[in-house]
Amino acid sequence: VPVAKLAVFRDPIAARADRNMAIGYTGQAYLWLDNKASAGGNPWLNPYSDEAVRFIGDLIGEVQSMGFDHVLLENVQFPSAQNGKQDFGSTGGRGRSAQLAADIAAWDARFEGSVTLWYGYSLGQVTDGASTVGGSATALGVRNLVVEVPAKQTMDDTARNELRNTLSASG
């Protein structure tokens, strides 16, 4: 089955094209970058932006119109760099995990019955919890989870059981 893969919030092209969908610097009119500009830093789409969530939904619809019935969404997360200079605009009082869960629920509802959405996360984001997702990716309400295990990392029986238990506990 052909699967389309989309980078979601880590989309520097869309962030530059429509600054209203991007993370900004607090108190400035500049786009926030995940590294120094001289080191190739890139802007990200803002998970709190309704416009960004709609835009991503429109991208899913576009790949669906190309004939893809399965879409893998990666980078459904916040940037790992947290320096207090990021301006997410109005958060509505939602934490990171709650916001990502709401974004995921919106896409799942929009494409229910027409596209199977898969969400890709690293092993660490699933088992250890991460600031990029506001906890464990298993708490986001994801129905179809793809777990990326680093090629150099072998999983012993204990690690395999921990992953199995984490995934089982999340439903």
Identify the meaning behind each predicted range:
Residues 10-61:
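Active-site-adjacent "subsite" loops/lids of carbohydrate-active enzymes
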Residues 44-85:
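Active-site groove signature of glycoside hydrolases
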Residues 84-98:
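Glycine-rich tight-turn/loop motif centered on a GG-T
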Residues 157-171:
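C-terminal soluble interaction/assembly domains
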Residues 3-11, 71-75, 94-132, 171:
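Aromatic-lined carbohydrate-recognition surfaces of secreted/lumenal glycan-active proteins
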Residues 52, 56, 100-104, 160:
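Aromatic/hydrophobic pocket-lining residues that form the small-molecule binding cavity
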